[in-house]
From Swiss-Prot:
This is Ribonucleoside-diphosphate reductase large subunit. It is found in: Cytoplasm. It catalyses: a 2'-deoxyribonucleoside 5'-diphosphate + [thioredoxin]-disulfide + H2O = a ribonucleoside 5'-diphosphate + [thioredoxin]-dithiol. The record marks 789, 792 as: Interacts with thioredoxin/glutaredoxin.
Length: 794
């Protein structure tokens, strides 16, 4: 049997040579668990004569990755093999790779099709010695296999389908793309990115330094007008943004209701549903950046709109196809008045914005007065019990996980953009809260801080380092506003006027574990608060320093910060004594701030996978989970838990199987000590009340909002109702992003008896009616006895 080498020559397969190559990459790994010989034996079994060395390396990497459940070091080894393979297949010198990317000729039409901009290339070539020597290629070996495969699949630029960039090249391209001729700042950013202190968002990593540097993640639009022109102009904006890889939030509350008169044609409106189906097809057709991700639009509606009941049905799996639009995402923009009416089971009036104008243009007391006035004037199209609508909302959430819940009055009351007008919606991921209008499309550029990195070897948290990195991030995101490619003019108008940015986090759960703080402990709750205090303080300080140099943003005059009112003041909270807020307020009074908004903890799905961290502000969902790559699916055990069990001599095949049998929970495994059971509770074992309380604690330092998922293993209407009301009363802006539930049955252990199925189908319809009655009773019970109701102990 022979292999074909990279130079085209042939060589016989040598067991020792393969083992030696793997052995060289095992430095620093736990030799009690990692066995290169075993990997070689498995690799040899999968070989055939004429295999290339590239394929051999790929097979070796995947073989190591399948052993990740034995020990997390296998994921590191798998990545090292894959990275070493990439290094052999790519050029080393950064400036040469950038030249190749610029000189690319498309073989289909023989046209010069540069993949980076001429400006980027010129800067790189003018500073090539500094930039080339600043890159530390060994840092490529710090990724785990699944992080590296994510980079390889979507982030590293390719020439004719073959990866041309190494991860370090990409990070330097991004840094130069942001900082241009400021080489010192580019190298500083490169070092922080490559050492994994933080990461820019996916669109920034995809597009920085290219011909179309569309570096923004989030776009928010309000319908331009309730007319064919307004609707299709907005739809065109959505298509152009989606084409450039942006996620979108759209406020649709101004669109007239079903059956209302249209003066221009002397006809009647078809309402929201047909319009949303057009949006649905646009999202399917125009994906984000040419097949990188599917197009994604979230539609925001206020619950007084006459079409609200139809809106809540749109994502459901059953029902008439022409009444469904399942590729969109749905969100409610909820005024406090609705929550009050649900609580007291008052009446709720459904209205058409054409007959009752201005409801989406005001909030708080002004909204309540206008709404009551329209009710008294008899302008409502339909009156229902508020709890009837609430029931429909809960039913939709239980079935589809949506609509998202955002509280309109909290979003406006606690916004630094109150001086601009009423905020009408959030974005696709519910963490951006910005003003939109007919001539302004709100935009946000994001980055996330890897919190696990700030835990020292002495198990202390380095707040100073967190502050210094935050200040760099603010400067980077502020620069992106000026160098960004804007898919529509209205987005550029908005972003350059108000200059918002969004700083989030990832690895909060990892930081707690490294500090040995159980997620619900008082220590974790204090650290949670102080982390966000620090980020908010440092972000304001950095933005104030930028304002001293360049002046405050255009619409600064009259905003709460200009009056000395910061986010925690709006929440009526007092910070801890970690930072000197009085001194900062004095600085801001003198110089202002350069950015209207600063913090927005986002979901971080892809970038957390790249850096090997748990997502965002979330607890671990399971201690055993799957990672998919193109070659297949791999099972992974929480690396922190695996390390702890290994150190205590508790890790073996039997333990692994017990954790799998318990679906990733360790709470009922007798051999595991109590301190580890506390530390490794999954989100299903943590009180959601604590999750909501911690969201409110950090919320006092978050001037936008946060992507907050709610996890209830088996939701009933009572639990869900009590949980929503608790979040609302805590003052949250985002009450819920997704409702996550556990599947009704474990697919691995589930078999079905056909006779049983027939019996079940007979009894289902009568049980459905009983279930509905029980759900209604549970919902009412939880509203009447929110503090005592046992059903609602979430």
């Amino acid at each position: 049997m022979h292999v074909i080498k990279r130079d085209g020559g042939q060589e016989g397969v040598m067991f020792d040579k393969i083992t030696s190559r793997i052995q060289k990459l095992c430095y620093g790994l736990n030799s009690d668990f990692v066995d290169p010989t075993q990997i070689t034996m498995k690799v040899i079994q999968g070989l055939y004569s004429g295999v290339t060395t590239v394929e051999l390396d790929t097979l070796a990497a995947e073989t190591a990755a399948t052993s990740t459940t034995k020990h997390p070091d296998y994921a590191i080894l798998a990545a090292r093999i894959a990275v070493s393979n990439l290094h052999k297949e790519t050029k080393k010198v950064f400036s040469e790779v950038m030249e190749d990317l610029y000189n690319y000729v498309n073989p289909l039409n023989s046209r010069h099709s540069p993949m980076i901009s001429k400006e980027t290339l010129d800067i790189v070539l003018a500073n090539k010695d500094r930039l080339n020597s600043a890159i530390i290629y060994d840092r490529d070996f710090s990724y785990n296999f699944f992080g590296f495969k994510t980079l390889e699949r979507s982030y590293l630029l390719k020439i004719n389908g073959k990866v041309a960039e190494r991860p370090q090249h990409m990070l330097m391209r991004v840094s130069v793309g942001i900082h241009k001729e400021d080489i010192a700042a580019a190298i500083e950013t490169y070092n922080l990115l490559s050492e994994k202190w933080f990461t820019h968002a996916s669109p920034t990593l995809f597009n920085a330094g290219t011909n179309r540097p569309q570096l923004s993640s989030c776009f928010l639009l309000a319908m331009k007008d309730d007319s064919i022109e307004g609707i299709y102009d907005t739809l065109k904006q959505c298509a152009l943004i989606s084409k450039s890889a942006g996620g979108i939030g759209v406020a649709v509350s101004c669109i007239r209701a079903t059956g209302r008169y249209i003066a221009g044609t002397n006809g009647n409106s078809n309402g929201l549903v047909p319009m949303l189906r057009v949006n649905n097809n646009t999202a399917r057709y125009v994906d984000q950046g040419g097949n990188k991700r599917p197009g994604a639009f979230a539609m925001y509606l206020e619950p007084w709109h006459f079409d609200i009941f139809d809106f809540l049905e749109l994502k459901k799996n059953t029902g008439k196809e022409e009444q469904r639009a399942r590729d969109l995402f749905y969100a409610l923009w909820i005024p406090d008045l609705f929550m009050k009416r649900v609580e007291t089971n008052g009446d709720w009036s459904l209205m058409c914005p054409n007959d009752c104008p201005g409801l989406d243009e005001c909030w708080g007391e002004e909204f309540e007065k206008l709404y009551a006035k329209y009710e008294q004037e008899g302008r409502a199209k339909r009156v229902v019990k508020a709890q009837q609508l609430w029931y429909a909302i809960i039913e939709s959430q239980t079935e589809t996980g949506t609509p998202y819940m955002l509280y309109k009055d909290a979003c406006n009351r606690k916004s630094n953009r109150q001086n601009l007008g009423t905020i009408k919606c959030s974005n696709l991921c519910t963490e951006i809260v910005e003003y939109t209008s007919a001539d302004e499309v709100a935009v946000c550029n994001l980055a996330s801080i890897a919190l696990n990195m700030y835990v020292t070897s002495e198990r202390t948290f380095d707040f100073q380092k967190l502050a210094s990195v935050t200040k760099v991030i603010v400067k980077n995101l502020n620069k992106i506003i000026d160098i960004n490619y804007y898919p529509v003019k209205e987005a550029e108008n908005s972003n350059k006027r108000h200059r918002p940015i969004g700083i989030g986090v990832q690895g909060l759960a990892d930081a707690f574990i490294l500090m040995r703080f159980p997620f619900e402990s008082t220590e974790a709750q204090l650290l949670n608060t102080q982390i966000f205090e620090t980020i908010y303080y440092a972000a304001l300080e950095s933005s104030c320093e930028l304002a001293a140099e360049y002046g405050p943003y255009q619409t600064y005059a009259g905003c709460p910060v200009s009056k000395g009112i910061l986010q925690y003041d709006m929440w009526e909270k007092t910070p801890t004594d970690l930072w000197d807020w009085a001194a900062l307020k004095e600085k801001i009074a003198n110089d202002g701030v350069r950015n209207s908004l600063l913090l927005a903890p986002m979901p971080t799905a892809s970038t957390a996978q790249i850096l090997g961290n748990n997502e965002s502000i979330e607890p671990y969902t399971s201690n055993i989970y799957h990672r998919r790559v193109l070659s297949g699916e791999f099972q992974i055990v929480n690396p922190h838990l695996l390390k702890d069990l290994t150190e205590r001599g508790l890790w073996n095949e039997e333990m692994k199987n017990q954790i799998i049998a318990q679906n990733g929970s360790i709470q009922t495994i007798p051999a595991i000590p109590d301190d580890l059971k506390e530390l490794y509770k999954t989100v299903w074992e943590i009180s959601q009340k604590t999750i909501l309380k911690m969201a409110a604690d950090r919320g006092a330092y978050i001037d936008q909002s946060q992507s907050l998922n709610i996890h209830i293993a088996e939701p009933n209407y009572g639990k869900l109702t009590s949980m929503h009301f608790y979040g609302w009363k805590q003052g949250l802006k985002t009450g819920m992003y997704y409702l996550r539930t556990k599947p009704g049955a474990n697919p691995i252990q589930f078999t079905l008896n056909k006779e049983k199925l027939k019996e079940t189908q007979k009894t289902t319809s009568s049980e459905d009616e009983e279930t509905k009655e029980r759900n209604k009773a549970a919902m009412v019970c939880s509203l009447e006895n929110r503090h005592e109701c046992l059903m609602c102990g979430s």
